[in-house]
């Protein structure tokens, strides 16, 4: 009976907190990325700006004899 209690205590007091603390491990990486200026909102603004500049008419309506009309 005491060994079962010891196993339960080991699981809930040692192993369970170790497993749950690893889930928060990515927070420091996110903080460093923000300090380097890799903000996601800035990346989204840049990607929208690039997409507006590109001529997507060619991709939306390919020429009749192009490869993409066969697909």
Swiss-Prot record:
The D-Phe is essential to the structural conformation. Since conomarphin is a cysteine-free peptide, hydroxyproline plays a critical role in maintaining a restricted conformation of the peptide. Residues 22-54, 70-71 form a propeptide. GO terms for cellular component: extracellular region. The modification 4-hydroxyproline is found at residue 64. Pfam families: Conotoxin. Residues 27-48 are annotated as: Disordered. Residues 1-21 form the signal peptide. Keywords: Cleavage on pair of basic residues, D-amino acid, Hydroxylation, Neurotoxin, Secreted, Signal, Toxin. Residues 28-39 have a biased composition (Basic and acidic residues). Expressed by the venom duct. It is found in: Secreted. The modification D-phenylalanine is found at residue 67. GO terms for molecular function: ion channel inhibitor activity; toxin activity. Negative results: the unmodified synthetic peptide shows no or weak activity on muscular and neuronal nicotinic acetylcholine receptors (alpha-3-beta-2/CHRNA3-CHRNB2, alpha-3-beta-4/CHRNA3-CHRNB4, alpha-4-beta-2/CHRNA4-CHRNB2, and alpha-1-beta-1-delta-epsilon/CHRNA1-CHRNB1-CHRND-CHRNE). May act as a neurotoxin. Belongs to the conotoxin M superfamily. This is Conomarphin-Mr3. The lineage of its organism: Eukaryota, Metazoa, Spiralia, Lophotrochozoa, Mollusca.
């Amino acid at each position: 009976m005491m060994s079962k209690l010891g196993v339960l205590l080991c699981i809930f007091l040692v192993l369970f907190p170790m497993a749950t603390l690893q889930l928060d491990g990515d927070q420091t990486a996110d903080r460093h990325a923000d300090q380097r200026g890799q903000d996601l909102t800035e990346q989204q603004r840049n990607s929208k700006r690039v997409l507006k500049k590109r001529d997507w008419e060619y991709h939306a309506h390919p020429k009749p004899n192009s490869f993409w009309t066969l697909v």
